[in-house]
Amino acid sequence: MIRVLSPFPDWLDLGGRTARPTQSDADILRARQQMVSEQLQVSARGITDPQVLKAMEKVPRHEFTPENVRAEAYDDTALSIGHGQTISQPFIVAFMTAQLQPQPEDRVLEIGTGSGYQAAVLAELVREVCTIEIVNPLAERARADLQRLGYNNVRVLSGDGH
């Protein structure tokens, strides 16, 4: 089955608590776990799919952010990744992923790779992800980051997904 992931309305309430990691691996891991427990699982936000929560906890969001905003990587906010683009806030990524209801045998097409973070989350849940980014430098950086992090089931294409 092929599923297409698309954005949702910008009117959704995106308020939430934040967790600022330091540079130590242990602190970053704690910040990622806190992101899941405090921003995504709280009843008002309603992310309940255990597989989605596990994927969000596993994927190192800080590895998909520029160095100058890395300390904010686990805040529930969009962050600039250059070229006028942003990495979506964690709640948005979790919400879209949960709405997709991914299955292990799925092949997913993502239009708008950005940093590659959403593709990495999806890659934890499905057989294959093909993602297309129109901004070539972002596609190249996402491809390199995904490969470096071992996401071999993600194919990054540079081009217009329209």
PLM-predicted stretches and their roles:
Residues 2-109, 125, 140, 148, ...:
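Class I SAM-dependent transferase core
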